[in-house]
């Protein structure tokens, strides 16, 4: 049974790794140009600090996933995984939340602040950012499930009732 749990959690880690890689690739390659009143402006992820944070957080999570898969076969490392899985889940959640807030402003604008929506002028950029955010959201959900699995592995011996 323990072997099945490890296989399942490593499968989830590989899914999370795939989601983080997709999120990073789509965010880093997102760029577009638009011409407004004979002025050309270019948008790319690196123009926005929140999108940089998103990429860095996804990269940290992806690196941790690789390390955790390599070290998951050592029994002493499993207790530490709970804490690191929690940190990674929180990191992914904070980065996706911040990036979603900025993406919403880019898509809808903010009439109270006088910010106009930009996605009508740069649709390719917004489409790529949307795909990156969906992949990042998937990674965060997978990591939440991983956190629950890690908690179960660590806490299940505590709640075992012996007759």
From Swiss-Prot:
TM helices/strands, residue ranges: 7-27, 53-73, 80-100, 129-149
Subcellular location(s) of the protein: Cell membrane
Pfam families documented for this protein: CASP_dom
Membrane topology: Multi-pass membrane protein
Positions in the Extracellular compartment: 28-52, 101-128
Annotated glycosylation sites: 38
Major subcellular location class: membrane
Any single GO CC term annotated in Swiss-Prot or TrEMBL for this entry: plasma membrane
Alphabetical UniProt keywords: Cell membrane, Glycoprotein, Membrane, Transmembrane, Transmembrane helix
Cytoplasmic topological segments: 1-6, 74-79, 150-163
Subunit structure: Homodimer and heterodimers.
Family stated for the protein in its record: Belongs to the Casparian strip membrane proteins (CASP) family.
The protein's name in its UniProt record: CASP-like protein 1C3
